[in-house]
């Protein structure tokens, strides 16, 4: 049973911070050291001061957790942050520009009871890295707070929740935010008991699919085991932003792979394994360009296994299609993923079980081509966007995909609501 509850959200005080657009930041794992420095320097109340970036200070990693904890406590004492007296759900409508068009995504924020994966209430789709989990554990333990929502997915096939959220959006937003990258956020506090009861009841029998935030979820699991004493403890709940699978603003973008620093013999062996599995046709990048190649891969991939290959020079590319006489279904459900086929049947054969650690991952096809041109990479593989229905089928069946198989977009902003892990929900 899923226990999705309203939480006593902790929010920035607009009387002090004034402009919420200067508060929000991307998820921590999308923030490199340069962006972190810029946000900290230019925006004294930005959420990055609390959430941090993907890599803590390598010279003194504990310092970042202590600084975040101290600042968080100061902001609470100074009323920069104020906790809602009553528990609420929160609704965010995130409007953004994409490919010359406008899209909107809805995210419903609240607290999900933290449970082990074997309970099958929260379903993961990838494995985690221990250092990244430890980083988030230390932040939770230092601050006793969760600064960003975990993005997860649910299915509302009967459109039960949809009219409830539509009714909320019929009211004036509690907050409207225009950010510097042409995004528009509307934010509502859901405070009426009828809506809160209906939302809680709706999710009781709905599995929750983790989209972004596996490391944060597993950090919450460990924090719970170390600190929880009662079922209603805030430590037992992790803040999530739940997005419906068919939300028109939800996108799964492709994640590509690149390899560099391998020997000529290994590269030749990779080519041999590819030739054993795929039929190849050349693609002239000097005529059509890498974006056209990516679009063709996406189109061809609707009905078959397709991989694009870049290299060894910047104008050379191929489209690979899995040979028709290969019975890929015997490999199991994960073989629906080209990333799995590439990793398990090609790269691991050549590079061993650590093949995934040797790859560079990017959703920027042109960037990979540039790195081929500069000889930073020797070969790159372009993949199609992972189909949402295939994702739901594989993950719902208890399988986990290879690392960096999914790139959910848009990324949810950090800073709208903070979940305090002290007290009860």
Kindly label every feature range from the protein language model.
Residues 1-425:
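Surface-exposed, charge/polar-rich loops and edge strands
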């Amino acid at each position: 049973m899923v226990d999705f509850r309203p939480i006593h959200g902790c929010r920035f005080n607009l009387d002090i911070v004034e402009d919420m657009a200067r508060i929000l930041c991307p998820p921590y794992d999308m923030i490199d050291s340069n962006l972190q420095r810029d946000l900290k320097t230019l925006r004294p109340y930005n959420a990055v001061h609390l959430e941090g970036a993907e890599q803590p200070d390598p010279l003194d990693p504990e310092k970042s957790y202590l600084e975040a904890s101290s600042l968080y406590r100061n902001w609470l004492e100074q009323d920069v942050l104020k906790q809602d007296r009553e528990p609420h759900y929160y609704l965010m409508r995130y409007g953004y520009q994409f490919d010359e068009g406008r899209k909107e995504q809805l995210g419903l924020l609240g607290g999900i009871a933290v449970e082990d994966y074997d309970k099958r209430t929260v379903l993961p789709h990838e494995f985690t890295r221990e250092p990244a989990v430890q980083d988030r554990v230390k932040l939770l333990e230092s601050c006793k707070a969760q600064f960003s929502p975990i993005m997860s997915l649910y299915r509302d096939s009967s459109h039960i929740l949809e009219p409830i959220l539509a009714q909320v959006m019929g009211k004036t937003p509690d907050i409207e935010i225009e950010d510097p990258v042409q995004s528009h956020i509307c934010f509502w506090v859901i405070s009426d008991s009828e809506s809160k009861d209906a939302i809680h009841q709706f999710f009781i029998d709905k599995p929750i699919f983790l989209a972004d935030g596996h490391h944060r979820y597993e950090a919450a699991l460990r924090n719970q085991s170390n600190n929880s004493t009662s079922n209603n403890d805030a430590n037992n709940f992790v803040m999530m932003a739940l997005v419906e699978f068919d939300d028109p603003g939800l996108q799964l973008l492709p994640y590509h792979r690149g390899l560099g620093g391998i020997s000529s013999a290994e590269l030749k062996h990779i080519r041999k394994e590819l030739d054993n599995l795929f039929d190849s046709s050349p693609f002239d990048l000097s005529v059509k360009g890498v974006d056209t190649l990516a679009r063709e891969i996406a189109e061809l991939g609707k009905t078959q296994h397709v991989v694009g290959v870049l290299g060894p020079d910047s104008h050379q590319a191929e489209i690979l299609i899995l040979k028709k006489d290969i019975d890929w279904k015997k490999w199991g459900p994960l073989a629906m993923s080209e990333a799995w086929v590439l990793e398990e049947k090609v790269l691991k054969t050549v590079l061993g079980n650590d093949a995934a650690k040797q790859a560079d991952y990017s959703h920027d096809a042109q960037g990979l081509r540039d790195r081929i041109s500069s000889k930073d990479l020797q070969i790159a593989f372009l993949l199609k966007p992972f189909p949402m229905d295939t994702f739901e089928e594989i993950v719902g069946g208890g399988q986990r995909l290879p690392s960096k198989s999914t790139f959910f977009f848009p990324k949810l902003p950090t800073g709208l609501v903070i979940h305090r892990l002290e007290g009860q929900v």
